[in-house]
């Protein structure tokens, strides 16, 4: 039987209520649970263990994806890795069985609840859409598409022809796949973190693996407090 770990990212300035609720839901599966706590201006890497529940305190670098990457590298001997933002909640108790089934298919590289429909297009199409607005990096204007592709190239990831990607709300990957892609890139700011989110799916496809949404509809097994069930827009802007 494969050995799995649930890794939850949490920002210490937020209320712990969602985190506590998610931990309670995940405990029924009897797997190891790790909460990676992002803390501003923190200089240590500190682990606290309580049976199957551990807390890893770290500097807030790379936001959720940075926390997930740290968790995988710290707990590197599991077969399957399930990553969650603390705002996630389980909608279907069969989620673990479904995800393990999908992870057992060798061609499947990454599993999640929501492939971003607004970005499920070619880069050429994206460059013509209003979503490709200008941002400022180092006080210099640049279009989002150009910047995200540039960051991927900096990270030695081929952007490919498509911007298709799984939202970094929850992901599941095997240890074999994580080693193949060498974990996740770490963004230094919000825009770099968006680039990191897209680049993980791009690297999965670069390795000839598939990006898998767990069901035809969004958020069938795992919901998120910020997102509507159709996956098109947030319920509220933070």
Predicted regions and their residues:
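Short loop->beta transition adjacent to catalytic acidic/histidine clusters or analogous donor-positioning motifs
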Residues: 2-4, 26-35, 53-54
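A conserved hydrophobic helix/loop-capping motif in glycosyltransferases and polysaccharide synthases
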Residues: 4-15, 116
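Short, well-formed alpha-helical segments that are part of the catalytic scaffolds
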Residues: 13-27
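C-terminal catalytic/acceptor-binding lobe
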Residues: 14, 180-238
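Acidic ATP/Mg2+-coordinating residue in the GHKL
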Residues: 37-40
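Short beta-strand-to-loop acidic/aromatic patch adjacent to the donor-nucleotide binding site
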Residues: 78-89
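Conserved catalytic core of nucleotide-sugar-dependent glycosyltransferases
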Residues: 90-188
């Amino acid at each position: 039987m494969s050995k799995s770990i649930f890794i939850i990212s949490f920002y210490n300035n937020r209320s712990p209520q969602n985190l506590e609720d998610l931990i309670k839901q995940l405990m029924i599966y009897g797997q190891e649970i790790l909460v990676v706590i992002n803390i501003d201006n923190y200089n240590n890497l500190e682990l606290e263990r309580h049976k199957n529940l551990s807390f890893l305190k770290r500097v807030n670098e790379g936001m959720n994806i940075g926390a997930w990457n740290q968790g995988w590298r710290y707990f590197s001997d599991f077969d399957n890795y399930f990553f969650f933002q603390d705002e996630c909640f389980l909608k279907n108790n069969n989620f673990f069985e479904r995800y393990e089934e999908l992870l057992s298919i060798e061609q499947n590289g990454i599993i999640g609840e929501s492939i971003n429909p607004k970005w499920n297009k070619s880069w050429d199409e994206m460059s013509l859409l209003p979503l490709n607005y200008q941002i400022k990096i180092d006080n210099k204007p640049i279009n989002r598409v150009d910047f995200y592709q540039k960051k991927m190239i900096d990270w030695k990831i081929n952007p490919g022809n498509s911007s298709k990607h799984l939202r970094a709300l929850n992901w599941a990957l095997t240890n074999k796949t994580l080693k193949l892609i060498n974990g996740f890139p770490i963004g230094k700011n919000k825009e770099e973190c968006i680039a990191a989110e897209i680049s993980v799916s791009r690297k999965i496809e670069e390795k000839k693996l598939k990006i898998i949404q767990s069901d035809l509809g969004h958020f069938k097994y795992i919901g998120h407090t910020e997102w509507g069930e159709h996956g098109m827009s947030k319920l509220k802007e933070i």
